[in-house]
A protein has these predicted regions:
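Conserved catalytic motifs of the protein kinase core domain
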Residues: 7, 16, 32, 84-86, ...
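Unchanged
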Residues: 39-64, 71-120
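A conserved beta-turn-beta hairpin within the catalytic core of GNAT-like acetyltransferases
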Residues: 27-31
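Predominantly a core beta-strand signature of beta-propeller blades
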Residues: 18, 65-66
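Conserved acetyl-CoA binding element of GNAT-fold acetyltransferases
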Residues: 32-38
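Conserved N-terminal beta-strand and adjoining loop/helix that marks the start
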Residues: 1-19, 36
């Protein structure tokens, strides 16, 4: 039986922009812009995973409480639709939080991160 994968991701908003990160060409989903996200490990909650993954990928520490805003249960990988569950959390920051990929534990997963507005 195929494993049902569970992930968590965070939409970080500052003013009218959200933070996205461009996946490394060597990682899954190469060169795609996405939310900082990753697998839920062991017995951690989806929110704990979202906060941990965000820190590991961006070196930004988020508060311990985020708003759950939705779920994604299908995704594309290598041109194939796969099933899984991604919990999507939201955090709005009053100040711009700047990722530091060089200091991030898993910063190698991305080539850069930047804020995008609806216009982009």
């Amino acid at each position: 039986m195929k494993e049902f994968k569970r992930y968590s991701g965070v939409i970080l908003k500052h003013k009218d922009e959200v933070l996205l990160c461009k996946r490394s060409p060597e990682e899954s989903l190469p060169n795609q812009w996405s939310l900082p996200s990753g697998h839920i490990e062991g017995k951690e909650s989806p929110m704990e995973a979202a906060i941990r993954e965000f820190k590991e990928e961006t070196n930004i520490k988020l508060p311990s409480k985020l708003d759950l805003i939705g779920f994604i249960n299908k995704y594309q990988k290598d041109g194939v639709t796969k099933k899984g569950m991604m919990y999507v959390f939201f955090y709005e920051s009053k100040k711009e939080l700047t990722p530091n990929l060089e200091k991030a534990k898993d910063g190698h997963e991305h080539t850069k991160c930047q804020y995008f507005s609806k216009k982009n």
